Structures are given as structure tokens and as C-alpha cells.
């Protein structure tokens, strides 16, 4: 959610992913085809938040400055996939929304 003081035109800044992990559900779904994740990971690290609302995108942009959690959403083979980078940038998890 956008806070009243947040400028909608904030430019996101580079951030680190930390350890990159996937859930068991995503692992089973991919069946070894981990390369299918690379385009989404690339979009996430380049601040393209995917299929999220404008408000969530602005919050993510601010999160890159404030050290808050970053959540992006993409579609892979008809399934929604989330990528979440934790506030301290220690880990980035790739998961299905129902695994949250």
C-alpha cells in the first residue's frame, strides 16, 4: 500500500538477491527445468515487478531504498509465481502464492 508521503515517481535502486531458493512445490513443478526461472529472476533483479498492481510496484520501488521486502509476481506455464526478496537481502525465495 502506498503511504501518503510516497512519491509515485521514485526510481528503484539496485539490490542484491542473497541466497536464491525455491520451494518444493516450484521444484516439483519445474521437474529439473530450472532455466525457465531465469527470465523471471532477471526481471525481478532489474526492478520489473511483473503482474502486480501500480500500488505494489511503487511500494517495491520504495522498498529498494528503505530496506523492505520486495515481492514480484509472474506467470510460468499458466501458473502464478512469486519472487520475494527479504528486507535484509539475505534470501530470495521463488514460490507459488499458495505456499506463502
Task: Give short role names for the model-derived ranges.
Residues 63-100:
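Short, compact, well-ordered microdomains
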Residues 5-71:
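Compact soluble domain cores
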Amino acid at each position: 500500500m502506498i503511504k501518503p508521503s510516497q512519491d509515485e515517481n521514485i526510481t528503484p535502486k539496485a539490490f542484491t538477491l542473497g541466497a536464491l531458493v525455491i520451494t518444493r512445490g516450484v521444484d516439483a513443478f519445474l521437474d529439473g527445468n530450472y532455466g525457465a526461472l531465469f527470465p523471471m529472476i532477471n526481471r525481478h533483479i532489474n526492478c520489473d515487478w511483473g503482474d502486480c498492481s501500480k500500488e505494489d510496484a511503487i511500494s517495491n520501488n520504495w522498498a529498494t531504498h528503505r530496506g523492505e521486502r520486495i515481492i514480484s509476481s509472474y506467470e510460468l506455464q499458466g501458473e502464478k509465481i512469486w519472487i520475494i526478496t527479504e528486507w535484509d537481502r539475505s534470501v530470495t525465495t521463488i514460490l507459488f502464492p499458495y505456499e506463502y
